[in-house]
């Protein structure tokens, strides 16, 4: 796992708060991380 993914975790915890479409982004990021 990369530090970038860890740094973005806080934002992913609140997808409806500011990033409603983050669901698709996190899946792509995790796929790249793995």
Swiss-Prot record:
Modification after translation is described as: Processed by the macrocyclase-peptidase enzyme POPB to yield a toxic cyclic decapeptide. POPB first removes 10 residues from the N-terminus. Conformational trapping of the remaining peptide forces the enzyme to release this intermediate rather than proceed to macrocyclization. The enzyme rebinds the remaining peptide in a different conformation and catalyzes macrocyclization of the N-terminal 10 residues.
Q: What molecular function terms (GO) are annotated for this protein? A: toxin activity
Give the top-rank taxon of the lineage listed in the UniProt record for this protein: Eukaryota
Q: Specify the propeptide location in this chain.
A: 1-10, 21-34
Q: Where is this cross-link: Cyclopeptide (Phe-Pro)?
A: 11-20
Q: Which UniProt keywords apply?
A: Toxin
Quote the function comment for this protein: Probable toxin that belongs to the MSDIN-like toxin family responsible for a large number of food poisoning cases and deaths.
Q: Which family does it belong to?
A: Belongs to the MSDIN fungal toxin family.
The identity of this protein, by name, is MSDIN-like toxin proprotein 2
Source species: Amanita bisporigera
Gene symbol here is MSD2
């Amino acid at each position: 796992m990369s530090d970038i993914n860890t740094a973005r975790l806080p934002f992913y915890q609140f997808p409806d708060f500011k990033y409603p479409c983050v669901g698709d982004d996190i899946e792509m990021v995790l796929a790249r991380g793995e």
